[in-house]
C-alpha cells in the first residue's frame, strides 16, 4: 500500500487543506499519516474529523524573527523534532510528504529530504512564512496561492484551493431556526475571526450589541462557547462545521481577518467582505499584504484593527452594500481559484 505523510499546524489555516486532501488519498487506497504536535490544533482537528489517519507527535519549537532566550531552547526542540521525524520516515518509507506550513512542519520536511522522500509544500500567503522559507530549500516543489517571484524556480502558481463552492448547499434544520430570529428586511453581517483572531470582533459585538442588532442581523463566530447566544437579530456560536458554508451564504457581508484561506473562500462565492487584518504586532504582516492585494483587485474593503470602531465599520459596510454589483462582478471574473478535485489530480500527477 502506498503511504503519504502530511504535516502542518499551529493554526487552522495550516491544517485546512490537509483535511480536504486526506480523504481523497484514503479513498484512493493510500495509507495516510500525519506528523504534528499532539498539543496543537492539528491533532484536535484530525480527531474531530474522524479520518483514518495515524498521528505521530514530535517536539516542536517556535521559529522567531527576533532575539529571545527561548530561541536557544527551541533550537534543541527543533533538532529533536528532526531526529523523531527521521525515525518516522525511515520506519514508514512513505512515497511522499505534503506540508501546509507552520512551525511544526519544518522538522518533518528536513527529515523527509534527508531520507530521500519527495517533499511537496503549499504556501497560501502573498509572502512566504519563515517555516516555508526554510522548507522551500528542501522541497521538491512548492504550490502557491499567489504568484511568486520568478527566481523561485520550484514554485508552481495554482491559485487558491477552497473548501467552499459557488453552488448552494442544502439548508440544515439549524439554519432555519436561526433565520426565524432574523429580520428579513435587515442586511446580515457575519463576523469570522479564525482560530486566533476572533477576540476583537467578539469585543466589538459585545460592546455594541444593541446598535448592531438594530441595524443588522449579526452572526458572530466567536471561538468561545461562553458567548453562545441566539436571540432577536443575533446568533453567536463558538464553532461550526456543516453550518459554515450555509452561514456564509446567508450573510450579505462578511467581516473577516486576512488569512488567505478565508478570504479566498469568500472570493469563491463572490461574497462582499471587509478585511480586518492582524497587525504586525500579532503576525509577520502577511494578512496586511493579503488585504492590500484584495483591495487592489477590487474584491474587498479593508480596515486596520487600530482603526476599527462601530462608525468606521459601518462606513465600510455601507460602501460595500451600495456598490454590491461592482465588487461581485470583479470577484466573479477572478481566475485565481482551483477546485479541490483539480488540485488533487495535479498533486497525484506530480507524485507519479
Curated annotation (Swiss-Prot):
One biological process term in Gene Ontology: carbohydrate metabolic process
Membrane topology: Peripheral membrane protein
InterPro entries: GlcNAc_MurG (IPR006009), Glyco_trans_28_C (IPR007235), GlycoTrans_28_N (IPR004276)
Molecular function terms, GO-annotated: undecaprenyldiphospho-muramoylpentapeptide beta-N-acetylglucosaminyltransferase activity
E.C. designation(s): 2.4.1.227
Catalytic activity: Mur2Ac(oyl-L-Ala-gamma-D-Glu-L-Lys-D-Ala-D-Ala)-di-trans,octa-cis-undecaprenyl diphosphate + UDP-N-acetyl-alpha-D-glucosamine = beta-D-GlcNAc-(1->4)-Mur2Ac(oyl-L-Ala-gamma-D-Glu-L-Lys-D-Ala-D-Ala)-di-trans,octa-cis-undecaprenyl diphosphate + UDP + H(+)
Cellular compartments annotated: Cell membrane
One Pfam family matching this protein: Glyco_transf_28
Keywords: Cell cycle, Cell division, Cell membrane, Cell shape, Cell wall biogenesis/degradation, Glycosyltransferase, Membrane, Peptidoglycan synthesis, Transferase
Binding residues for UDP-N-acetyl-alpha-D-glucosamine: 195, 287
Superkingdom as given in the UniProt entry: Bacteria
Gene Ontology cellular-component terms listed: plasma membrane
Gene3D superfamilies recorded: Glycogen Phosphorylase B
Enzyme class at the top of the EC tree: transferase
PANTHER family per the UniProt record, alphabetical: UDP-N-ACETYLGLUCOSAMINE--N-ACETYLMURAMYL-(PENTAPEPTIDE) PYROPHOSPHORYL-UNDECAPRENOL N-ACETYLGLUCOSAMINE TRANSFERASE, UDP-N-ACETYLGLUCOSAMINE--N-ACETYLMURAMYL-(PENTAPEPTIDE) PYROPHOSPHORYL-UNDECAPRENOL N-ACETYLGLUCOSAMINE TRANSFERASE 1
Annotated family: Belongs to the glycosyltransferase 28 family. MurG subfamily.
Job description of the protein: Cell wall formation. Catalyzes the transfer of a GlcNAc subunit on undecaprenyl-pyrophosphoryl-MurNAc-pentapeptide (lipid intermediate I) to form undecaprenyl-pyrophosphoryl-MurNAc-(pentapeptide)GlcNAc (lipid intermediate II).
Protein's name according to its UniProt entry: UDP-N-acetylglucosamine--N-acetylmuramyl-(pentapeptide) pyrophosphoryl-undecaprenol N-acetylglucosamine transferase
Organism: Streptococcus pneumoniae (strain Hungary19A-6)
Amino acid at each position: 500500500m502506498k503511504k503519504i505523510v502530511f504535516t502542518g499546524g499551529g493554526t487552522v489555516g495550516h491544517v485546512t487543506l490537509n483535511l480536504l486532501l486526506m480523504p481523497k488519498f484514503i479513498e484512493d487506497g493510500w495509507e495516510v499519516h500525519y506528523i504534528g504536535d499532539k498539543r496543537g490544533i492539528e491533532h484536535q482537528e484530525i480527531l474531530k474529523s474522524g479520518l483514518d489517519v495515524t498521528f505521530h507527535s514530535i517536539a516542536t519549537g517556535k521559529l522567531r524573527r527576533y532575539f529571545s532566550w527561548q530561541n536557544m531552547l527551541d533550537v534543541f526542540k527543533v533538532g529533536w523534532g528532526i531526529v523523531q521525524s527521521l525515525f518516522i520516515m525511515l520506519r514508514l518509507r512513505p512515497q511522499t510528504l505534503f506540508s501546509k506550513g507552520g512551525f511544526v512542519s519544518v522538522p518533518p520536511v528536513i527529515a523527509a529530504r534527508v531520507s530521500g522522500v519527495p517533499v511537496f509544500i503549499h504556501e497560501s500567503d502573498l509572502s512566504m512564512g519563515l517555516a516555508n522559507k526554510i522548507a522551500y530549500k528542501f522541497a521538491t516543489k512548492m504550490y502557491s496561492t499567489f504568484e511568486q517571484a520568478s527566481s523561485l524556480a520550484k514554485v508552481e502558481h495554482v491559485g487558491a484551493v477552497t473548501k467552499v463552492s459557488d453552488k448552494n448547499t442544502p439548508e440544515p434544520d439549524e439554519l432555519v431556526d436561526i433565520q426565524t430570529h432574523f429580520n428579513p428586511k435587515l442586511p446580515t453581517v457575519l463576523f469570522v475571526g479564525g482560530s486566533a483572531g476572533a477576540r476583537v470582533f467578539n469585543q466589538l459585538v459585545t460592546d455594541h450589541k444593541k446598535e448592531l442588532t438594530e441595524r443588522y442581523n449579526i452572526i458572530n463566530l466567536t471561538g468561545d462557547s461562553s458567548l453562545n447566544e441566539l436571540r432577536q437579530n443575533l446568533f453567536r456560536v463558538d464553532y461550526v462545521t456543516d453550518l459554515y458554508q450555509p452561514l456564509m451564504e446567508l450573510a450579505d457581508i462578511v467581516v473577516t481577518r486576512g488569512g488567505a484561506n478565508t478570504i479566498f473562500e469568500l472570493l469563491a462565492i463572490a461574497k462582499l467582505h471587509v478585511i480586518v487584518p492582524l497587525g504586525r504586532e500579532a503576525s509577520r504582516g502577511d494578512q496586511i499584504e493579503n488585504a492590500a492585494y484584495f483591495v487592489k483587485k477590487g474584491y474587498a474593503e479593508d480596515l486596520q484593527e487600530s482603526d476599527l470602531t462601530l462608525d468606521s465599520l459601518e462606513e465600510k459596510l455601507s460602501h460595500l452594500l451600495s456598490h454590491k454589483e461592482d465588487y461581485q462582478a470583479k470577484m466573479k471574473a477572478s481566475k485565481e481559484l482551483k477546485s479541490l478535485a483539480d488540485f488533487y489530480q495535479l498533486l497525484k500527477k506530480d507524485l507519479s
